[in-house]
Amino acid sequence: MPDRVLTAAEARQNLLAARGGCIGHFEVVDLMGLEDESIVDRWRDHRQIVSVRDDAGQWVFPVWQFVRKHKRIMLGIRDCLAELPFESELEPLIFFLNGMETLGGHSPLDCLRSGKIEAAIKAARQYGWRKGT
């Protein structure tokens, strides 16, 4: 029996659930130890954090972008986001989570986690060029 093709809704849910899933606004505030809740909104508005609306229309944030121990966003996330096109809210998730030939089959997130920040930023730049940005 051939593999079933995912619907758009299923693919979206898979992206949101990948690598630990997503957390809401207040969980980000708590995780990061922020005193000012509006910081998360500013980060989102200025594309300094990966965010997407859930099925209820609420902003959620993939947990994989946070370094819990140090209460910060993973190094390189913001730099990559600055290079990426935003044709859809899911574009950054697709970029960070999928393996890329230029990264030896690894995902940009894998590169960031292993300290290969410049490689991930270069991949974001190339991804943007391919998209025509």
What is the predicted role of each segment?
Residues 1-133:
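Non-transmembrane "mature" sequence context
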